[in-house]
Regions:
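Secretory targeting and sorting signals
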Residues: 2-26
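N-terminal module-boundary/linker segments of secreted carbohydrate-active enzymes
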Residues: 26-72, 204-206, 219-225
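A general boundary/transition motif marking the beginning of the first structured unit of a protein
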Residues: 29, 90, 179-182
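Secreted/periplasmic proteins that engage bacterial cell-wall peptidoglycan
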Residues: 51-123, 128-129
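Domain-level detector of nuclease and nuclease-like folds
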Residues: 97, 106-225
Length: 225
C-alpha cells in the first residue's frame, strides 16, 4: 500500500478531508467518487434535530461570497456552471450572467433565465442541504469560516426552477424530493456528500427516506463536486 493509499484510508475512516495534491488530485477524486452513497449514508451519525436557536442566514457569512477568489460571486459561478447559451455582461471579466437557459435538474423543464429585478427569480440557487437544516444537524458547531464554505460550496449548490426552490424551503429528504423521479438518486447522494464533508448528521426519518431512494440505485456513487 502506497503512502497516499494509507492517507486515503485513514482519512476515510476518520471522516477527514483529504489534502489536495496538484499532481495526484485526479487520482484522489477518482478514489473518492468510488464511495457509494449507501456506504456514505451508513457512516453518518443519526440524531434528532438540534434547537434552531441562533440560526440566521448571517451565520453563514455574506450571501454569495467570492470564496474561491476568482473575481466572481458564487451565484454567478453556479449560473455559469449550470446554464447553457450564456450571454455575459461586458466589462465584468466574464462574471455576470445576463441570459441563459437552464435544464432544470428538479423538474426536467427548460427555463429561460433573464437577469432582472423580478425575472431573475425564475432561476434560483438552491442549497442542496438547506442552511437551516444544516444548522440543526450540526452546522451550529462549525466555525464561521466552515459555515461560509458550506454556504458557497458548489457541491451544495444547484441552479433550479425558482418555484421548486421555494417549495422545498428548508426541507430534508423526508419532507421534500424533486418531482423528477429520475434525479432523486443523484439528489439524495448529493445531500449525503455534503453532510459527510461537513460532518453533519441525519435524523432517523431523513435517513430512512434517503435509504428508500438509494435502494433503487444501490450503485449510486457519492459526488465530489
Amino acid at each position: 500500500m502506497s503512502q497516499w493509499d494509507k492517507r486515503v484510508a485513514v482519512a476515510l475512516i476518520l471522516g477527514l478531508s483529504l489534502p489536495v495534491l496538484s499532481t495526484t488530485s485526479s487520482v484522489a477524486t477518482l478514489r473518492l467518487s468510488q464511495i457509494s452513497a449507501v456506504d456514505a449514508l451508513s457512516s453518518l451519525p443519526v440524531k434528532g434535530r438540534a434547537a434552531k436557536t441562533g440560526f440566521s442566514r448571517d451565520q453563514f457569512g455574506p450571501a454569495w461570497s467570492d470564496v474561491d477568489h476568482n473575481g466572481c460571486d458564487t451565484r454567478n459561478d453556479i449560473l455559469k456552471r449550470d446554464l447553457v447559451d450564456l450571454l455575459l455582461k461586458e466589462r465584468t471579466d466574464n462574471c455576470v450572467v445576463l441570459t441563459g437557459t437552464l435544464i432544470d435538474k428538479y423538474s426536467g423543464e427548460e427555463i429561460a433565465f433573464t437577469r432582472g429585478v423580478s425575472s431573475s427569480m425564475e432561476v434560483q440557487i438552491d442549497h442542496v442541504v438547506a442552511l437551516s437544516n444544516a444548522w440543526v444537524t450540526g452546522a451550529y458547531k462549525l466555525s464561521d469560516l466552515q459555515r461560509k464554505a458550506l454556504a458557497n460550496d458548489p457541491l451544495n449548490l444547484f441552479a433550479v426552477k425558482g418555484r421548486l426552490n421555494s417549495q422545498k424551503s428548508d426541507g430534508d429528504a423526508a419532507t421534500w424530493l424533486p418531482p423528477l423521479k429520475s434525479f432523486r438518486c443523484a439528489y439524495v447522494a448529493q445531500q449525503v456528500a455534503v453532510k459527510k464533508k461537513y460532518k453533519l448528521w441525519v435524523t432517523a426519518p431523513e435517513k430512512a427516506a434517503i435509504a428508500k431512494i438509494l435502494s433503487s440505485c444501490p450503485k449510486q456513487q457519492l459526488p465530489t463536486k
